[in-house]
Amino acid sequence: MVRVLGWACSAASACACAVAVGLGACTAPPKDPMAVLTNPRSLSEQQLGAIKGLSAGARPIDTDAAREVRRLVFAPGIALGTRQAAFDLLAEDDRNGLREALETNIVRMDSFEFRRWVLEQIGARGMKDFTAVVVNSWAGAVPVWGPDERGRPEFAALAAMYGPDRVPDALFAVLNESHPTRQAGLRARTWEILIRLDERAALRDLVMKSSIRPDDAMLRDIKQLVDELGILPETREELLWLAKLRANASPEYWKAAGEALRAIPEDRKQGFELRGVPVALAARRHAPELLSRSREGLYDDLMVRLRTRDASKYSANFTGWETGPRRTEVLGLQRDEVRWIDLVACNLALALVDDPAVRARLFDMGDRDQQDRRTEYGGVIRIDDAGNWSVVEVRPRVTGSDLKFEAPQELFDQGYTALFHFHLHAQEFENGGYAGPHMGDFGYANSTRANCLVMTFVRRDTMNVDFYRHGPLVIDLGTVKRP
């Protein structure tokens, strides 16, 4: 028997007792490692001992053992040392299985410390066959790692394997050598990372000067977009948007888009985003003079217009939410952040909500939304060839919460050519505390890259209107009255 602080423990359970009182770890290999690995009640030290037991046994480990060890790499609540030992064993005995699991799951890891360690190991061990793992990890933002792309552990991993000056070359190799269909997601993520590394010129050269294989729809679509509209997409969302447009938009749409963009001075098209195409189209149909206006002129005029509309009187309540140090809806505080296309979009938004027919439609939707406790209401706003506005109501994908609008596929499909995605905050007629987009709305704008509007009841006869897009950037456009 082993006696610890008055607790009597058998030799078989000494390990658990030692852990219970914090006196250290017992990692001796068990007689049956698989019994430990498949037991959900096993302690971390026992799991680590099981990995040691497998390492000391017949090698390579069999399929069942590899599956259980892979689980330890990703399952929640596993000790860092156990995860690291599992990675080491799999890197030797189940390299392909480890790589495939990491390609899918590295972005889901709940331990950023372990994720960084994995990336460091990939670089230090020269695991070039894990390059896709590094790309997949790099594709998503990790706030604790900061905004500097070259300071991220993924950059360091590729630099260790290929050389600090060859990281873009390694990424271009992924883009060029990955299968256009089976690895479309990987290629889109790689494209976005190269944009973030400021490789725009090289990407433009790739699509304009290189031969593109017939089945490479992504690069073919990008080349046509650059040829016809001069736009280089930057994000995965824009690449999806482009693919949908290429598949569904009519030749007349592309012709009209080209004519609209040719009306825009070249200096306004620097960094032009795909979301700018429906804005330019709408401006050409409704107010073509907007396309020749300067950013400064549009900004100053919009500031004057907003002074008479109660702009910034109402705003959403973000108490308890981390929104960053400069979250604001006031145009006057965002002169440096607002873009030319945002100002054109805001002018169009004011024009449409000043149209009595549009306001009647929005207030009708708002009244029905206020009575419907199952969902928020929303849809898209278009403009036809004659310059007439069209408010298209789209039913939500699911219902069950009066605090959100679950966008269905129909909204996305219609939204690719629409001017605005919109939804209502109409839980109450006096809803000023929700006047503006909130956290879920910011996520939607970031993921779709769309131009968005939210209309909020602040009185029974008054709605507040906010424009927002990715970033997030929000501009309070003031209030409109029931017609």
Where are these regions (language model features)?
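Short inter-helical turns and helix N-cap capping residues of alpha-solenoid HEAT/ARM repeat scaffolds
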Residues: 42-43, 77-79, 110-111, 146-148, ...
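Short beta-strand scaffold segments in enzyme catalytic cores
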Residues: 374-384, 453-456
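Structural detector for internal amphipathic alpha-helices that build alpha-solenoid repeat scaffolds
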Residues: 45-60, 81-95, 104, 115-128, ...
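Amphipathic alpha-helical scaffolding segments comprising HEAT/armadillo-like alpha-solenoid repeats
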Residues: 27-38, 60-74, 95-107, 128-143, ...
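Active-site-proximal loop/helix of nucleotide/amide-processing enzymes and allied scaffolds
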Residues: 207-304, 405-483
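Long amphipathic alpha-helical scaffold segments
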Residues: 263-360
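Short consensus segments that form the blades of beta-propeller domains
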Residues: 367-373
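Bacterial N-terminal signal peptides
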Residues: 10-22
